[in-house]
Amino acid sequence: MKLSMPRFDQAPVLVVGDVMLDRYWHGGTSRISPEAPVPVVKVDQIEDRPGGAANVALNIAALGAPASLVGVTGDDEAAESLTNSLKAAGVLARFQRIADQPTIVKLRVMSRHQQLLRIDFEEPFRTDPLALSAEVYSLLDGIKVLVLSDYGKGALKNHQALIQAARKRGIPVLADPKGKDFAIYRGASLITPNLSEFEAIVGHCVDEAQLVTKGAQLMQELDLGALLVTRGEHGMTLLRPDQQALHLPARAREVFDVTGAGDTVISTLAAAIAAGEELPHAVALANLAAGIVVGKLGTAAISAPELRRAIQREEGSERGVLGLEQLLLAVDDARAHKERIVFTNGCFDILHAGHVTYLEQARALGDRLIVAVNDDASVSRLKGPGRPINSVERRMAVLAGLGAVDWVISFPEGTPENLLTHVKPDVLVKGGDYGVDQVVGADIVQAYGGEVRVLGLVENSSTTAIVEKIRGQG
């Protein structure tokens, strides 16, 4: 399955559910308490992050999709912290505030990136389901997907009314279920239980075949459009009526913290479906996103640039021949890893030893080397009739096979100035015996603080000489 980045900016999503605040106390620990055999943590940083349904909305907004949120909080400092964080992220949050109940807070005590203790401040909310539903109904006409983020804390008490209201409007409903009564999600377009939640409903599954069988039965019983079971290190399994099961392996390179991974899955799914993606593609994107977020500490969101870079890696475009959009993503990724970008350009009509030596020297000036190649029409204008000898596709394919070259791109103009304006390399390199001020594009690179280098040519190595020799022998 070929992955691509959806147009999230045209994908409004509404999240309804249990809102909470994830609070982190960070500090160092170097001794054991004399009062009890527990570590003493000297807190030096306090951090608040939206959690639960608020984290789902935050993830959707981080992908670039318009996100709205309806939930329940107390009327307290934690609710203010949530409101401010969500507003800063561009989330439209509408909270039903309960004056005599606290906002749900999950407090984690952290030291050296390890969680030492979690303290929960919560009690089930006594909410007015009709008031909450009215808030949801007022927002339904402006959205493309409805998400029910259910943590069983009391915000969601009228699942069926919300599902039916959305279905009447043709709006898909995605639910992240909790509890032992999945009947409340009847008629949903997709539910996303993890394996333990799924098995709590259908019983233990001895293998994938049994998981598929029991999942199909559950979909039929609950009139579900689809079922996605998230299975940790075993990936995900997507089930749809009358279609073959789709198993996706886990994508995490390193698992650092699984907090909020389920939120990332349903938020990416919702945004992708709202953007018009087919369900298998949306699930593949969600699987990719989950693999990224578990590599972060604590409740975290995945950004659009992070997902784009992951798609690029998945599609094998970390190296090779790229278009401009792909190249800019690759450059952004390299810069995120503090890599130095080197740029050179030329016709490279017949690749010879001089070219190889020159490109190796250019690559040694940084971490990544971009080679921009004149297209065929451009070469013909520069070199005259009969050139190029090799088409631009062949020239780029040969260059991409060199160990010194990371990315190859073609350009139609006589000079690479347009590319330089977009890419902004750290180093612009040319081969020749002229001064830096004579290098085309030097002024562009130097204007933003980049470096321009001129490398000497290898003697007795010339494409023109090779072409003339071949023609003379012909």
From Swiss-Prot:
The organism's taxonomic lineage, starting at the top: Bacteria, Pseudomonadati, Pseudomonadota, Gammaproteobacteria, Pseudomonadales
PANTHER family linked: BIFUNCTIONAL PROTEIN HLDE
Renumbered residue ranges of the record's region Cytidylyltransferase: 343-474
InterPro entries assigned to the protein according to its UniProt record, in alphabetical order: Bifunc_HldE, Carboh/pur_kinase_PfkB_CS, Cyt_trans-like, PfkB_dom, RfaE_dom_I, RfaE_dom_II, Ribokinase-like, Rossmann-like_a/b/a_fold
Quaternary structure annotation from Swiss-Prot or TrEMBL: Homodimer.
EC numbers for this chain: 2.7.1.167, 2.7.7.70
PROSITE patterns attached to this UniProt entry: PFKB_KINASES_1
Protein name as it appears in the record: Bifunctional protein HldE
Region Ribokinase: start-end pairs: 1-318
Catalytic residues, chain numbering: D263
Keywords: ATP-binding, Carbohydrate metabolism, Kinase, Multifunctional enzyme, Nucleotide-binding, Nucleotidyltransferase, Transferase
Biological function: Catalyzes the ADP transfer from ATP to D-glycero-beta-D-manno-heptose 1-phosphate, yielding ADP-D-glycero-beta-D-manno-heptose.
Assigned GO CC terms: cytosol
GO molecular function: ATP binding; heptose 7-phosphate kinase activity; heptose-1-phosphate adenylyltransferase activity; phosphotransferase activity, alcohol group as acceptor
Cited Pfam families: CTP_transf_like, PfkB
Pathway entry: Nucleotide-sugar biosynthesis; ADP-L-glycero-beta-D-manno-heptose biosynthesis; ADP-L-glycero-beta-D-manno-heptose from D-glycero-beta-D-manno-heptose 7-phosphate: step 1/4; Nucleotide-sugar biosynthesis; ADP-L-glycero-beta-D-manno-heptose biosynthesis; ADP-L-glycero-beta-D-manno-heptose from D-glycero-beta-D-manno-heptose 7-phosphate: step 3/4
Protein source organism: Pseudomonas syringae pv. syringae (strain B728a)
A Gene Ontology biological process term: ADP-L-glycero-beta-D-manno-heptose biosynthetic process
UniProt-annotated binding residues for ATP: N194, L195, S196, E197
Family in the record: In the N-terminal section; belongs to the carbohydrate kinase PfkB family. In the C-terminal section; belongs to the cytidylyltransferase family.
Catalytic activity: D-glycero-beta-D-manno-heptose 7-phosphate + ATP = D-glycero-beta-D-manno-heptose 1,7-bisphosphate + ADP + H(+); D-glycero-beta-D-manno-heptose 1-phosphate + ATP + H(+) = ADP-D-glycero-beta-D-manno-heptose + diphosphate
